[in-house]
Each structure stands twice: as structure tokens, then as C-alpha cells.
UniProtKB/Swiss-Prot annotation:
The gene is pgi3. It catalyses: alpha-D-glucose 6-phosphate = beta-D-fructose 6-phosphate. The keyword Transferase does not apply. InterPro entries: G6P_Isomerase (IPR001672), G6P_Isomerase_C (IPR023096), Phosphoglucose_isomerase_CS (IPR018189), SIS_dom_sf (IPR046348), SIS_PGI_1 (IPR035476), SIS_PGI_2 (IPR035482). Catalyzes the reversible isomerization of glucose-6-phosphate to fructose-6-phosphate. GO terms for molecular function: carbohydrate derivative binding; glucose-6-phosphate isomerase activity; monosaccharide binding. HAMAP family: G6P_isomerase. Belongs to the GPI family. The lineage of its organism: Bacteria, Bacillati, Actinomycetota, Actinomycetes, Mycobacteriales. This is Glucose-6-phosphate isomerase 3. Its main location: cytoplasm. The keyword Cytoplasm applies. Its EC number is 5.3.1.9. Keywords: Cytoplasm, Gluconeogenesis, Glycolysis, Isomerase, Plasmid. One of its GO terms (biological process) is gluconeogenesis.
Length: 550
């Protein structure tokens, strides 16, 4: 990605024009914008794959969109997009290509990186995953005692956990082979203990996911899980109950995992973009090769849309630029992600890593400091739970929080309402539409007074509206539509990184804490006196030791 070096980004003409235009928008209200433009909904609605995306309830006009696209052109978003898709080393701080999009290319595609045909590599790995998971699902792969595997425990952290957890939770209705998944990520021993409780070691398979096979949390949990298994079944059982997703064969072999049970991936796939790689092995075990392929096809649908759609109808480009609009020009610090599907309960957490680890940067790619806010803070809960938790702030609070509403026309599980004649899903979606409507248009003092409300209560009941939101509708939550949703957000993050001139594909900010934790471990364990170099940490460690061993 290219940072603006000759001229500060915030001093460029497109940026300054948007700053001036933002002052004009201050004088606008969505009520007036809709009233003055009967074509507004059609003008600000796009389709990408199976996703119907209405962004008409945003604090924008046609002029806003024009200026945002001018800014995108000025930093060459399209050229940077093409560089990414062609395998150029756009991750400049690590000198790597960024090719999560290659994970979902069809078999007959052609793409080489550094002289290597990576499409062939990808499909060889997918084939190996498919063969393995088919054996697991149909019972040809048996545990050490001859039992069929009924539980797969994925041990990983970060992208090796958040993606598989989210996808499995979203698509568990497609798990049709009697295999359930559990996920262990946290260094807190309660995580592993809770997930092992009630399991039969003879019917349990562990997938250890770590690129280097040295990640502290993952290897600590994997070692504890190994002890649990060996205590029940003996040392020889390890090869039948552990497989690895890693690129480091030697420590994997030393752990006791057979070479043929190692599934590799590549340094051009970042962890937070890796669920379509062998990192998704546990998901494929649950839902099967065919459904996993549908997930990849969904990703590819949006990849192609992003690559080919013109700017005015390019959903990831438009939504990414809206994120820039609110973050850099409108003072918004966060975005609420509100899936009206309980199956997407982990989707906001997944997006937190995707956007915050990618764009939580304060220097440009050339090392110069960024002069504007970067990195949207994502948060949210499924509807209607969120309505009874934090929607009060969205409707009447002082903070500007753009929201994404995600809903589906068909439910994976529908039940009748209290009357026995209606649909619970229809009632859920009535709430879905109502919330975005009230956020946008609110309720005026005059409208409340007309209802004979107490004069003292009128100010408390006023709903100001003018709160922006995107509505994303799809026919049904399927592997394909889930892949489309994920890719829609992936490419938004990319667009924003290009505009801000930052490297969206490194994560140096997480490294120092790991180093410091290892340095502090002896003092925390009581093997050395606290001498960390700062008095607060030393005092806290001493207090911890006193409380731990009273």
C-alpha cells in the first residue's frame, strides 16, 4: 500500500474537500434527505452476490459519495487492489504477498507468487483436507481403541480460533456427520478444562493450529491436552488423536504427530484471513467438503465483485469509504455490527480482529506518523438481545455510532409466535426493520406532544434520529452467504488501509506483550524477585504472589 509521502494525506485536495463538505452535512437530517429525493433508496442500494445492501440511511448525499470516490481514486485504491490480487508484496513491513483471495480461486485459475504456482498448492491442500475429513466423517478414521471420532477439539488462538469458531457457530446446522466441535484458545486453564469435561478420550481428536508450532497459548494447551489423552489411552494413542495445521514439521513430529497428518499453509495468508485455508480443517470436518467449498465459493463471489464492479456500485469500496467518512471526518469512534441471527453470535468478535488488528496502526507504510484517526472499533451483539442492552445509547446517546444491520429472509429455525399463527422469524425481522427506521428518522417533540405526553417527559421521549446505518439482507444464512459476508468486510478493511496509507496486514503491536510476558514469568511464578524496571508492575507482582500463596 502507498502512503502519501510528498504531501500529507490530510492536506490533499480530496481530503480538504471532504472536510468542507462535512460541515454542510452537519446542517442535514435524514428526514429531509429522504423527503427531498424520491429516488434515494434506489440510488444508495447495491447488490453483491446474494447480498442486498441498502446504505440510504447514511449521512451522505450524492456529492458525498462523489467526494469519497475521488479520495479513493487519489490514493489509487483500484491499483492497490489489483496489486494485492496479483500477488505483489503489499505487506511491506514483512515483505510478503497478501493472497487470502487465492484460497478461494477455482482450480483452473492461474496465479504464481515468486515463481510458485500457488493455485496448485491451494487445491492440493484442499484435496488433502477433503480426503482426511471424509475418512473422519464416515468412520474410516478411528481412534486408538477403534472408536469413531465424535468430537473434534480445535486448539489455536487469534485467527486460528476466531474464524473457525465463528464459522462453525454460524453453520452448525450443516454439521451432518455426528461430529461436534469444541474450541480451546485461552491460556486460562478453565478454557481447556471446560472443553474437555464430559469427553471420551477414545472418541476425541485434537487439531493443533499454529504456523510455527511455538505459539505459547496453543502449545501450552496442546501439551495439557496431550497429557489428558495419554493418561487415559497411553503414549501410542497420540498419532490417532492429534493432527496439526502448521508449517514447522520438526516440532510437530517431536510432539508425536505423524508427518502425513500435518496440514500446511503459507506466509501470504494472515491469521485473521485464514479460515478458508487449512485453519478451517475443523469446520470441514463438521460440515463436510462440499459445504466448505460453498463457503469458499461465497468468498470468491465477493472477490470478483470487488475486482470488477465499477466504483459507484462496488459494495466493499463504498462501505469501506463510508467507514473512512465516519472515522476521519464525522468523529465516530466505533461501528456497531448487529446481526439479527443468533447463528452469527460470534461474527462481531470475528470482525473485531479483522478490522482492529488490521487497521489499528499509527504510522504510514513509510514510517511517518498518521495525522488522522484510523481503525474502526467494531462491537455488537445479535438482535434482539442488543435492543435490551445498548440500543439506548445508539438512539439517544451523545456518541455517533454507525450501525450495520444484517438479516436473512429465511430462518434456519422458525417457530410460531404466542398466537400460534405467526412466525417468530417475521417478528424478529419486524424488529430488525424498526430499529434502523427509528435510528434514521426518530420521533420529534411535536409528534410526541401530539400523543398527549406529559410536558415533563417530552424531552426524555424525543428520538433525534439522524443515526446512520447500513442494512444487509440475504435470502438465508448458508455457507455461500457467510463467505460473501466475510469477504465483504475483508475488502472494506483493505480499502480503508489504502486510504489511510497503512499496512493492514502486519500486527507488530501484539509482539512486545508476548516478549514481556516471557520475561516476567519467572517473577510471577516466584522463581525470581520482581525487577521489571517499573515500580507499578513490581508491586503488582508482589501483591499477586501474596494473594496466590496467603
Amino acid at each position: 500500500m502507498t502512503a502519501t509521502t510528498a504531501q500529507l494525506l490530510t492536506e490533499t485536495t480530496p481530503w480538504l474537500r471532504l472536510s468542507e463538505h462535512s460541515e454542510e452535512i452537519d446542517r442535514s437530517h435524514l428526514r429531509a434527505l429522504f423527503a427531498s429525493d424520491p429516488d434515494r433508496v434506489d440510488e444508495f442500494t447495491v447488490t453483491a452476490g446474494d447480498l442486498h445492501i441498502d446504505y440510504s440511511k447514511h449521512l451522505i448525499t450524492r456529492r458525498t459519495r462523489e467526494l469519497l470516490l475521488d479520495l479513493a481514486r487519489s490514493v489509487d485504491v483500484e491499483g492497490n487492489r489489483d496489486a494485492m490480487l496479483h500477488g505483489e508484496h503489499i505487506n511491506t513491513t514483512e515483505n510478503r504477498a497478501v493472497l487470502h483471495t487465492a484460497l478461494r480461486l477455482p482450480r483452473d485459475a492461474s496465479l504464481s507468487v515468486d515463481g510458485q504456482d500457488i493455485v496448485t498448492d491451494v487445491h492440493e491442500t484442499l484435496e488433502k483436507m477433503g480426503v482426511f475429513t471424509e475418512r473422519l466423517r464416515d468412520g474410516r478414521w478411528r481412534g486408538a481403541t477403534g472408536k469413531k471420532i465424535t468430537t473434534v477439539v480445535n486448539i489455536g488462538i487469534g485467527g486460528s480460533d476466531l474464524g473457525p469458531v465463528m464459522v462453525y457457530r454460524a453453520l452448525r446446522h450443516y454439521a451432518d456427520a455426528g461430529i461436534s466441535l469444541r474450541f480451546v484458545s485461552n491460556l486460562d486453564p478453565a478454557d481447556l478444562t471446560d472443553n474437555l469435561r464430559g469427553l471420551d478420550p477414545a472418541a476425541t481428536l485434537f487439531i493443533v493450529t499454529s504456523k510455527t508450532f511455538s505459539t505459547l497459548e496453543t502449545l501450552t494447551n496442546a501439551t495439557a491436552a496431550r497429557r489428558w489423552l495419554v493418561s487415559a489411552l497411553g503414549e501410542d494413542a497420540v498419532t490417532k488423536h492429534f493432527v496439526a495445521v502448521s508449517t514447522n514439521a520438526q516440532p510437530v513430529a517431536e510432539f508425536g504427530i505423524a508427518p502425513e497428518n500435518i496440514f500446511g499453509f503459507w506466509d501470504w495468508v494472515g491469521g485473521r484471513y485464514s479460515v478458508g485455508s487449512a485453519i478451517g480443517l475443523s469446520v470441514m470436518a463438521a460440515i463436510g467438503r462440499e459445504r466448505f467449498t460453498e463457503l469458499l465459493d461465497g468468498f470468491h463471489t465477493i472477490d470478483e465483485h470487488f475486482r470488477t464492479a465499477p466504483p459507484e456500485s462496488n459494495a466493499p469500496l463504498l462501505l469501506g469509504m463510508l467507514g473512512v467518512w465516519y472515522s476521519s471526518f464525522r468523529g465516530a469512534q466505533s461501528r456497531a455490527v448487529l446481526p439479527y441471527s443468533n447463528d452469527l453470535v460470534r461474527f462481531p468478535a470475528y470482525l473485531q480482529q479483522l478490522t482492529m488488528e488490521s487497521n489499528g496502526k499509527s504510522v504510514h507504510t513509510d514510517g511517518s506518523p498518521v495525522r488522522c484517526d484510523t481503525g474502526e472499533i467494531f462491537w455488537g451483539e445479535p438482535g434482539t438481545n442488543g435492543q435490551h442492552a445498548f440500543f439506548q445509547l445508539l438512539h439517544q446517546g451523545t456518541r455517533l455510532v454507525p450501525a450495520d444491520f444484517i438479516g436473512f429472509a429465511q430462518s434456519t429455525d422458525d417457530l410460531p409466535t404466542m398466537s400460534g399463527t405467526g412466525s417468530m422469524h417475521d417478528l424478529l425481522m419486524a424488529n430488525f426493520f424498526a430499529q434502523s427506521k427509528v435510528l434514521a428518522f426518530g420521533k420529534t417533540r411535536k409528534e410526541i406532544a401530539a400523543e398527549s405526553a406529559s410536558a415533563d417527559l417530552i424531552p426524555h421521549k424525543v428520538m433525534p434520529g439522524n443515526r446512520p446505518s447500513t442494512t444487509i439482507l440475504a435470502p438465508r444464512l448458508t455457507p455461500s452467504t457467510l463467505g460473501q459476508l466475510i469477504a465483504l468486510y475483508e475488502h472494506q478493511v483493505f480499502v480503508q488501509g489504502v486510504v489511510w496509507g497503512i499496512d493492514s496486514f502486519d500486527q507488530w503491536g501484539v509482539e512486545l506483550g508476548k516478549v514481556q510476558a516471557l520475561a516476567l514469568a519467572p517473577a510471577v511464578a516466584g522463581e525470581a524477585a520482581p525487577c521489571t524496571g517499573d515500580t507499578s508492575t513490581d508491586a503488582l507482582i508482589r501483591t499477586y504472589r501474596r494473594l496466590r500463596h496467603p
